[in-house]
């Protein structure tokens, strides 16, 4: 089976259109006929699909018409015109889509010798900043065309489809089609799904698509000589799994002509390293007699997956839950009759996909929207301003500079140069949405109006060039303050005045200067007196700030200690954590992600907290970097990663035994307790979770990640009203509903961590009857069976009294009412008792095996267990 669909088959086939479904709407469909004149549209006769012009979705390109011949009148109508791109390297269609929506994206290419050169066009096709495929539009036959199709979840509300010139031939395209799919269909563990085939098994020669197929999948007929086709006119009902195969597809099927032989379907991947998914469609379409049975084994590459009996006149879809690799790139699905079956195996249809990874993150969505609004406002026609503004780097927009940390972090725009660009009108307000901008150059244009105050809100902005325009008025006070306090350099024409500044008379200058000298002298003497008083006091403490030089590093030093960010330890909402060395000692370096909108606030909070608090169970801050938008935190290195890695088995090696889990819980509780009662003012962590509990060389536990921490008032009824922050599954429901933050919010989160350590269950697991761990634990507790709750990786190496006490404590911590939860002092005390009970039992039972273990879990709301 060829891995690339030839659209000649589609063009030559007659589409099957069922009159009963002609009323299907095309909501969410995008159907572009590339090259169609502006404002024109039509209904394609073979599919009833409405096609519109592509003019509003592309900035460049020229239109062409295929050469007429005897077959022209029979081909797919969107093939008759096309758009080609003789100018520029990258030309991109920009489509408005719904972020997070799963789409079937189809691009169609039909050469038709439009240029009279008989030259096969070859070029690359990109989806956003990532390569999708290489296109080779064959010219061997005038009917040949190529379709490239993919199932993809959109990352933003803008989708860029780009044609990239790779040689001497000119990229071209005939049509673009987008069809929204149901969110829970065609799900890959990672990446997107590149279509290889949609086959239905029949001896017909008709292709089937919309309106019979509500998703507009194009089903091609397929058969093999050793197969026999069967069909029915009876309606086959669909199953609610969302795949909705058309009646014309599911009413036909193939069986092996030799009833004792298997039904085998084989396909080839482009590379032996590729991964694939197969979707098999089954429905029993024969009326079986009482003594007839159809049951068969489904094997993939020789591995027996399931014994299956098709449902009578009801369609079901089966697929491999994990991607399949095939030896030598040759994949095989085989249906073999079981011993008790009287009938041969049957299959109605199959869809084949290969997995394609799109690793490069798109540029920050808000900044893409902003830069495109700027482009629209000023009618900029720069040919490079298409697609993603930052990546791939070789296609970045002229005049735009970006900070690209790694492929998993969205790039940020840090410099915009629009000098000598013929700009007119006022300075665009969209510029303020480029929140990481360091330099802005709008010089030598025809801009009018005043210098806008919003420029002062762009915190990283260091240089602004506005000379050579027709601006008027004065520099806003906020910008003058930035010049004075932050070192901002603002270049404006002489007619732009500074507010509050006048030319004083010479005698006034002399008087003011004299008074100033006296005032300065007095202030200096007062400051010296105050400083000496403070220095002599042993009870007063100087609060550390971000200006402490002994722990502040330059960004170049951060790069040096991480060997230019060579080894990644992990990633989180703040950014990427790298391994490094400082004075021959290992350190962990957390670098702020440019995409974090509250990154600097959290960074500052964490530095200020860790500079003033010290506890054996809080991770130590070695230093920090605060250099423009380059922010980093340098911590002590924790050799054994975080708790969740060990509970989930991602660290490999031996698992944590029961006593180790209790010790880790105790030490974590002591760290939280110190924040609650040992700090002045007291602090709430707000993001207690298993990934924020780090483990040292000897598995000593330390709490980390203080970016969300907040101070709180002391008192039983005291709370802080604040926006909700934290991690789903660990959030205190009372905090979530009322925005009331207290130390009991940390207690709730710790209860979830404790429940993870006890049960070995994920916090949220959709495959469970009860998705959330608390609900699951409550249902298990109703049976009073401790073994059904405890992590099976513990292999029953725990004491029931110790484990019950720990479980009851966890459920108490996650009580819906914060007033019913214990404080962290009591939690630490109770956990110590759990460990003492366990150790006492071990001493009394020296012959027990001490197997090690591992676990994972978390959830929302629950009650104290009553079963025992």
Curated annotation (Swiss-Prot):
The modification Phosphothreonine is found at residues 722, 727. The active site is at residue 687. Glycans are attached at residues 48, 68, 231, 235, 258, 291, 433, 446, 495. It comes from the Eukaryota. Residues 1-23 form the signal peptide. It holds the Pfam family Malectin_like. GO terms for molecular function: ATP binding; protein serine kinase activity; protein serine/threonine kinase activity. ATP binds at residues 569-577, 590. It catalyses: L-seryl-[protein] + ATP = O-phospho-L-seryl-[protein] + ADP + H(+); L-threonyl-[protein] + ATP = O-phospho-L-threonyl-[protein] + ADP + H(+). InterPro entries: Kinase-like_dom_sf (IPR011009), Leu-rich_rpt (IPR001611), LRR_dom_sf (IPR032675), Malectin-like_Carb-bd_dom (IPR024788), Prot_kinase_dom (IPR000719), Protein_kinase_ATP_BS (IPR017441), Ser/Thr_kinase_AS (IPR008271). It is a single-pass type I membrane protein. Residues 532-868 are cytoplasmic. The modification Phosphoserine is found at residue 721. Keywords: ATP-binding, Cell membrane, Glycoprotein, Kinase, Leucine-rich repeat, Membrane, Nucleotide-binding, Phosphoprotein, Receptor, Repeat, Serine/threonine-protein kinase, Signal, Transferase, Transmembrane, Transmembrane helix. The modification Phosphotyrosine is found at residues 635, 735. The chain crosses the membrane at residues 511-531. It is found in: Cell membrane. Residues 563-832 form the Protein kinase domain. Its EC number is 2.7.11.1. LRR repeats lie at residues 412-435, 436-458, 460-482. SMART domains: S_TKc. Belongs to the protein kinase superfamily. Ser/Thr protein kinase family. This is Leucine-rich repeat receptor-like serine/threonine-protein kinase At2g14510. It comes from Arabidopsis thaliana. The lineage of its organism: Eukaryota, Viridiplantae, Streptophyta, Embryophyta, Tracheophyta.
